[in-house]
């Protein structure tokens, strides 16, 4: 029932986005597009072809799931990606092994656990969530283990096949001690791998590509061909929705004659696990590697009045302060519903706002946001 309700809400959101575009004067065409030239695209839908022309072309066709070469996606063999999960067919499995302890893998671990499945995460590195601050990653690992989610680090899959009983046999190898283990499961979910989805006819543009088969662009999102731009997963880099939105605005500005180079400073991330993680700026490992003069400031939701009243008492905020400049280098949250708290950190890191200014903000009381001030005091 809850999934059905979520589907209804998402459909309303899509309708809202469509209405916003139409109010802005954007015409939407549904179908398969083919690039004819730098200034012409043809769209085929229901046997009819529509020719569209313009002075500029933006390639923003995203990416699709992929997998390591030795482990091809194959739904008939139980080796699946997020697309198969979101179709709904695999949500009722009793057991799942997830390859990758990245944001995608950890979010799906939370989903499957809430659906009642036994969950095992296999992570090639020595810890899950390598893009996060180490304190966040360790916190999430401990919370996962409390929930019964098994986390195996330094591990990868060497073999995967159905046995005679219809169970999927996954052979995982631990690179730390060179041992192997057989896991019996209903599905192997492969995460963190993707290939760019390229439109038909893109080769006609004779673009310059990088070594990962992504379109090369400059800081204005311009490709090697005049009037042709590219954004999002087709250019690689930071493959997140907020990065693609920023790149889209940069490309639009370039087309409109208001060129401003893209800046990823203050780019944040959110991991919708249980509990959640969010962050912006440098991790402590980054600050240490750069030999910066920094100080760690920390506060806990168990001491925040609003968090306690909501029952959100686990978790913390960790803030890295530049001792010399007295600005915020990074801000990292772990806890319940903390995805809504990261915006102040984004503003502080993006604009190099002094610590004193952030600390003295007259925030509403009682709110969870006050934990930022509590950490900086």
Regions picked out by a protein language model, each given a short descriptive name:
Residues 1-54, 132-155, 284-289, 374:
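N-terminal Rossmann-like dinucleotide/flavin-binding domain of flavoprotein oxidoreductases
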Residues 30-32, 37, 61, 81-83, ...:
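Short loop/edge segments at beta-strand edges and connector loops
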Residues 47-56, 177-187, 224:
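Core beta-strand elements of the Rossmann-like FAD/NAD(P) dinucleotide-binding domain
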Residues 65, 102-104, 135, 195, ...:
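Residue-level detector of alpha-helix initiation sites
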Residues 74-93, 182-255:
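FAD-site-proximal beta/loop scaffold in flavoenzymes
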């Amino acid at each position: 029932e809850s999934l059905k309700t979520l589907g209804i809400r998402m459909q309303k959101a899509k309708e809202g986005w469509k209405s916003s575009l139409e109010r802005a004067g954007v015409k939407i065409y549904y179908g398969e597009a083919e690039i004819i030239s730098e200034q012409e695209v043809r769209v085929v839908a229901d046997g009819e072809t529509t020719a569209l022309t313009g002075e500029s072309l933006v390639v923003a066709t995203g990416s699709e799931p992929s997998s390591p070469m030795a482990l091809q996606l194959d739904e008939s063999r139980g080796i699946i990606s997020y697309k198969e999960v979101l179709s709904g067919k695999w949500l009722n499995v009793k057991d799942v092994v997830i390859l990758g302890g990245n944001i995608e893998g950890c979010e799906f671990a939370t989903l499957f656990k809430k659906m009642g499945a036994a969950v095992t995460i296999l992570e090639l590195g020595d810890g899950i969530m390598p893009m996060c601050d180490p304190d966040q990653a360790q916190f999430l690992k401990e919370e996962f283990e409390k929930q019964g989610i098994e986390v195996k680090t330094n591990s990868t899959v060497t073999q995967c096949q159905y046995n005679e009983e219809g169970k999927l046999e996954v052979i995982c190898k631990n690179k730390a001690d060179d041992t192997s283990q057989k896991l019996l499961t209903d599905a192997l979910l492969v995460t963190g791998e993707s290939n760019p989805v390229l439109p038909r006819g893109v080769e006609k543009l004779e673009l310059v590509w990088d070594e990962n088969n992504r379109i090369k662009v400059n800081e204005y999102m311009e490709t090697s061909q005049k009037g042709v731009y590219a954004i999002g997963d087709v250019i690689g880099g930071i493959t997140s929705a907020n990065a693609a939105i920023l790149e889209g605005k940069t490309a639009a500005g370039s087309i409109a004659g208001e060129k401003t180079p893209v800046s990823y400073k203050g780019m944040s991330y959110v991991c919708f696990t249980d509990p959640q993680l969010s962050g912006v700026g440098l991790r402590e490992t980054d600050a240490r590697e750069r030999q910066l003069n920094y100080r760690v400031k920390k506060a806990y939701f168990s001491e925040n009045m609003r968090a306690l009243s909501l029952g959100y008492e686990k978790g913390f905020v960790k803030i890295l302060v530049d001792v010399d400049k007295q600005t915020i280098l990074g801000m990292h949250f772990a806890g319940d519903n903390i995805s809504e708290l990261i915006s102040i950190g984004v503003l502080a890191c993006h604009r190099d706002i002094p610590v004193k200014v952030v600390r003295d903000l007259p925030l509403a009381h009682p709110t969870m946001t006050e934990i930022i001030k509590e950490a900086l005091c």
